[in-house]
Amino acid sequence: KMAFAAGDTVDHKTFGRGRVTKVDGDSLYIKFARTGQTKKLLKDYAPIVKISS
């Protein structure tokens, strides 16, 4: 399992690159660069990889 923290840069299979804005238990709030939208995703199920912290 990967650990995530606010400020981490991630890449999502569908939404592309984004930045973690908040971690709440198993949920990650990620603001995606391409759309400018923030999405709430489950960290153990979302197709994301950490690029940098």
Label the model's feature ranges.
Residues 1-14:
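Mixed-charge, Lys/Arg-rich low-complexity intrinsically disordered regions
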Residues 4-5, 24-26:
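A short, compositionally biased
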Residues 16-23:
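Short beta-strand-centered aromatic/proline hotspots
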Residues 28-48:
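A short macromolecule-binding patch
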Residues 52-53:
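Compositionally biased alpha-helical segments
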